[in-house]
C-alpha cells in the first residue's frame, strides 16, 4: 500500500520572514550577472552573503561586448565586482585574487596574461593590476582610462563619470610608463593640461576631458 503524502495547511507552514526578499534579491542578482555556472555562482553568492562580504554581482545587465573574440572574458561589470571586493587592500596576493577571479568564471589564462604584463611579484599592487585590467577591456590607453573612470566613479549611471585627478594621474602615469613609447615631456604636458580642467571641476577628471585630446597616448 503506497504511503500517503503528508498534507499541511497554511497555518502549519512557517516561512522565515527574511526568505522572500532574500530570494527576490538573489533572483535579480542572477539575472544581472548572467553566470555561466548558476549552481557554482549561487554557492559563491550565499557564501559571501553569510560572511558579510561583497557579493559577486554586477550592478546592471551587460550586453555582450562586440569586440570580444569569445563570449567569455573580463567585462567592465565583472572588473567592478573585483574592485569592490579588493579595493580595501593596497596589495593582494595571487592566492587572494585567484579564487575571486574563478568565482566570476573568468579564464585563468587572462589573469596570467595581466600578471605577466605587469611583471607582478607575490604582492600585487591592486590599482596597478586594475589599470592593466582596464587595458584588457579597451586596448588603448585612452580607452583603458575611460573604462577606469566609469568603474571607479561615484556618479550615477549616465553621469559624467568623474574621479579624483590624483587617482587618474596615478593610473595614467603607470600605463604610460609601462607602454614605454610615450615621451616623458608628452606625459607631463598631458597631465598639466588636464590638471587645469580638473581644478575648475573640484579636482575631478571625467572622460570628456581627455577623450578628445591626442596627447594621452602616442
Swiss-Prot record:
Q: Which UniProt keywords apply?
A: Cell projection, Cilium, Flagellum
Q: Where does it reside?
A: Cell projection, Cilium, Flagellum; Cell projection, Cilium
Query: Which GO BP terms sit in this record?
Result: spermatid development
One GO CC term, this protein: motile cilium
Please name the InterPro entries in this protein's record: ROP_DD
Q: Does the keyword Transmembrane helix apply?
A: no
Membrane-spanning ranges: none
Region named Disordered: 199-218
- Domain RIIa as annotated: residue spans: 17-54
Assembly mode: Component of axonemal radial spoke complexes.
Q: What does this protein do?
A: Functions as part of axonemal radial spoke complexes that play an important part in the motility of sperm and cilia. Important for male fertility. Involved in fibrous sheath integrity and sperm motility, plays a role in PKA-dependent signaling processes required for spermatozoa capacitation.
Q: What family does this belong to?
A: Belongs to the ropporin family.
Protein name stated in the entry: Ropporin-1-like protein
* Organism taxonomic ancestry: Eukaryota, Metazoa, Chordata, Craniata, Vertebrata
What gene codes for this chain?
A: ropn1l
